[in-house]
Amino acid sequence: MGWLKYFLRELLEYVSLMRTTWLAVWGVFFLAGTSHAWDGQYQVIQQDPIEKFPKWTGILGSVQAELNKQADIQAPFAGGWAEFIEKTKSDDRLAMIKKTNETFNSMRYVPDQKNWGVPDLWNTPIQFTQSPDYIVPGRMSGDCEDHAIAKYYALQRLGFTQDELRVLVVKDLNLGVGHCILGVIFGGQCLILDNQIKSVWPANQIQHYKPIYAINETHWWQFIPAGTAAPAAAAGGQAD
């Protein structure tokens, strides 16, 4: 997938910007002074700045204003974005997570090339839930990062903090392709919301994904194989 190649290239170009201040664990993220290996397989190291990921920061720059402006506009899905939030906001937190996953998983997976005529386009939740007429009017669709982004912001609107949320880029070892999912820190573990998996599962019970990096609104984290030295500082280039 084009978006995975894009981010991998950025990851290599900006590896010099690493600094180890947080430990994010594939299964749970928590504060720590140094990085450790996850289950003997990965070190997870905080990286900054997120501005090196312009597609992600582009979403951040527009989505909150869009959601606030259109909070009362009824999108086609589930009676509308605002109605979904209203119906879900009184649920317990685990029910919120499950309902968010179920609701957005009901929307079709359609690659960006087919949906928008471009190889890679990251959509805001409102864009994702209001499909272009040239696909199927009234049917919502998007690719994996669109599902993950919509779930991220739905849970934020329901009261989850960004520290509890991670957009995760992984490699699907079964299919040999890149994939994007959402991780939610809940009950001392990381729950995975995935458009390819119907139910919500703890990350440590999903064996066919190789984590590459995680990102939220303030930081990103790289997964490095255990036993591999953290790359030394080096000159970095400019992101596209």
Regions found by a protein language model. Give the residues of each.
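Bacterial N-terminal signal peptides that target proteins for export
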Residues: 3-22
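Short non-domain terminal segments
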Residues: 5, 15, 27-28, 36, ...
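A structural boundary/capping signal
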Residues: 33-240
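Bacterial N-terminal signal peptides
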Residues: 21-32
